[in-house]
Amino acid sequence: MYLEHLSLTDFRSYAQVDLKLGPGVTVLVGSNGIGKTNLMEAIGYLATLSSHRVSTDAPLLRFGTERALIRAKLVRGEQSTVIELEINAGRANRGRINRSNPVRARDILGICQTVLFAPEDLALVKGDPSNRRRFLDELLVSLVPRHAATRSDYDRVLKQRNALLKSARTGKFTAGHEATLDVWDQHMARAGAELLHARLELVERLRPHLNSAYAQLTDASKDAGAVYRSTIQGVLDDDGGPTDHGTEPSPSVDDLRLLSVDELTERYVQAFAASRKKELERGISLVGPHRDELELVLGQAPAKGYASHGETWSMCLSLRLASYYVMLDDARTGGTAPILILILDDVFAELDVHRRRKLAAIVAGAEQVLVTAAVDADIPEELAGRRVTVVPGGIDGEG
């Protein structure tokens, strides 16, 4: 399956643009700031309903407009699927599948799958824990679209619970509020348990692929690992930082992976009770998946703060490759051909020659690879393919 046609209306800098694509490698070349990333961002948005560049939808709408439209035609063999996503200012986004009646935006999830490499990926290693939690949750949604509702439910309950805790901090907390908090504890425990259970399973699947990808990129100079730190095991301090380190999950975290959603729910209820006094004092929820950490490890040390610039890039690339391999595993297990689109957005300009060639050799065999670059010289010869020239406001030529 591959993306054959992309059409954008009032998305970012584009009033209207159409891009024809095919299987194999396509390289989009154009000067910086010309709009190449906008095209890749739109494709990624179809896959995850989120942007890798901004946290809200407002910047995605061309200035002065009230809505943007992304339309994509996907081809598998003799069959094609057209998906549309309407991004609206001030109201819910809507989707369409094969020009059907409008559906919820999240109903189009899982049709178009992407793995996007971008300069912003440095935040996966160097940034706050929220970047790594977002990486896990976006991958979860790509693999199992129903997890979009799982995360949405958790965020809704967390917002309500935090509002209640905040009212306590301002001196407005009553016995009635405490009973209400007990109810929200139950809701948040269940929603948190479902999200935690899914994340733990995903990390277990990612870990061997992460180490393998890092070895491919660096000739196995160090082992690469990932350790999930959960607040219900007390392995994080109150500010969200890890209190210990290691290349393998601690026994307590490993035990969590063996628990059912019901058992994790009970663990959360207990953790909320134990932390209630401190939460009431601070007016915020201190326990839950929203404060967990995915710690990335190189050798015996955490990658954040210890990895060199080159090692940091290798770890970022390895995380994306690991997600690609997990998606391939699912596609093959499901009895369908891989349906993944690999997007490398201005990545090669950030890498040394060795890493460029290693990465290019790994991804060159994918069914569809989209690459952006400011100049042809940034593209390794392993990714020689069709060239498209991007100019202000549109596409100039295709080769």
Swiss-Prot record:
The RecF protein is involved in DNA metabolism; it is required for DNA replication and normal SOS inducibility. RecF binds preferentially to single-stranded, linear DNA. It also seems to bind ATP. ATP binds at residues 30-37. It comes from Paenarthrobacter aurescens (strain TC1). This is DNA replication and repair protein RecF. It comes from the Bacteria. Its main location: cytoplasm. The gene is recF. One of its GO terms (cellular component) is cytoplasm. HAMAP family: RecF.
